[in-house]
Amino acid sequence: MGSLIIEDLQEGFGKEAVKGKEITVHYTGWLENGTKFDSSLDRRQPLTITLGVGQVIKGWDEGFGGMKEGGKRKLTIPSEMGYGARGAGGVIPPHATLIFEVELLKVYE
């Protein structure tokens, strides 16, 4: 079983993302072979989620933890913390490692 790899690309200086907080993010996701499968930037539409409650894949719930507003990270997410054996929507194959570049735009009180 692989483990989540978190690389800080840019440190944030705003409020901190913690479990139970609602956050707004931008993201782009790639497969290991470089195929981009999704990007909120391409849609110009950020995503708002509640952190740590299972709304998103486990790699996101853990990967955004401790991040501060304005920060950017690269998350390398093993299959077990992504979509696992089932894959997703015909776009993400089974057992795929996922690579995301994420930006934390806002943490809500």
Curated annotation (Swiss-Prot):
Record function comment: PPIases accelerate the folding of proteins.
InterPro entries: PPIase_dom_sf (IPR046357), PPIase_FKBP_dom (IPR001179)
GO molecular function terms listed in the Swiss-Prot or TrEMBL record: peptidyl-prolyl cis-trans isomerase activity
Protein name as catalogued: FK506-binding protein
Matches recorded under Pfam families: FKBP_C
Catalytic activity: [protein]-peptidylproline (omega=180) = [protein]-peptidylproline (omega=0)
Domain PPIase FKBP-type: 20-108
Activity control: Inhibited by FK506.
Sorted UniProt keywords: Isomerase, Rotamase
EC number(s) per entry: 5.2.1.8
Top enzyme class: isomerase
A Gene Ontology BP annotation from the UniProt entry: protein folding
